[in-house]
Curated annotation (Swiss-Prot):
Any GO BP annotation: coenzyme A biosynthetic process
UniProt KW Nucleotide-binding keyword: yes
Function as written in the Swiss-Prot or TrEMBL entry: Catalyzes the GTP-dependent phosphorylation of the 3'-hydroxyl group of dephosphocoenzyme A to form coenzyme A (CoA).
Protein name: GTP-dependent dephospho-CoA kinase
Record organism: Archaeoglobus fulgidus (strain ATCC 49558 / DSM 4304 / JCM 9628 / NBRC 100126 / VC-16)
Catalyses which reaction(s): 3'-dephospho-CoA + GTP = GDP + CoA + H(+)
Keyword GTP-binding part of the UniProt annotation: yes
Pathway as given in its UniProt record: Cofactor biosynthesis; coenzyme A biosynthesis
Family stated for the protein in its record: Belongs to the GTP-dependent DPCK family.
The entry's keywords: Coenzyme A biosynthesis, GTP-binding, Kinase, Nucleotide-binding, Transferase
Length: 186
């Protein structure tokens, strides 16, 4: 598997919320996230956040999910809410070249007005990292903060610089064109 591996030393830094934390539980919490209305595109990472968004009528332009929450229980949501489903693989604590490729394909489809689900065999948690780098300024990523609520991460120049610094600290476990693009291209 080619891509990036998260070193143990970075796990604590990436576990912190990197956006505005909305505390609470349940679908109604998403209705409090005022950033959704102005975000283009609006993205979710994680099954519970994606399922909750769909339930309250806020189907994301791009969702990344793996069918599980906290790596255990299955979470079901309406895949029919999406125009396209792209399947990919990504091991825990990695950003695989396959995941980067799937995200790039999904973003092209989103540009054409399609709603896209990237379904990951493995783990989707770290998808937030490449998404910040790949999404345009003004995009919004919602992801779960275990035991606390939902994080609304608005993509801006500051976040892009932060993420590029984090990406460059990760361990390269095999190069691919998508990885070169992620680390250096814009």
């Amino acid at each position: 598997m080619k891509g990036l591996r998260l070193p143990e030393s970075m796990r604590e830094e990436l576990a912190k919320p990197h956006g505005k934390l909305y505390r609470g539980k349940g679908e109604k919490l998403l209705l409090e996230v005022e950033e959704i209305s102005e975000a283009k595109p609006f993205c979710t990472v994680g099954d519970l956040v994606t399922a909750s968004a769909i339930k309250v009528g806020l189907t994301p332009d791009l969702a990344v999910a793996d069918g599980k929450t906290l790596r255990e229980e299955n979470v079901e949501f309406e895949q029919e809410a999406f125009d396209e489903v792209i399947e990919t693989t990504n091991p825990p604590a990695h950003i695989s070249c396959e995941l980067i490729s799937a995200l790039l394909k999904a973003l092209k489809l989103c540009e054409d007005g399609k709603k896209v689900l990237v379904f990951v065999d493995g783990e989707e948690d770290l998808a937030v990292v490449p998404l910040v780098k790949l999404l345009p300024l003004g995009a919004l990523i919602l992801y779960g903060q275990p035991g606390e609520g939902v994080v609304a991460l608005k993509v801006d120049e500051e976040k892009k610089v932060l993420i590029l610094n984090l990406l460059n600290k990760m361990e390269i476990i095999g190069e691919c064109d998508e990885l070169k693009y992620l680390l250096g291209g814009d």
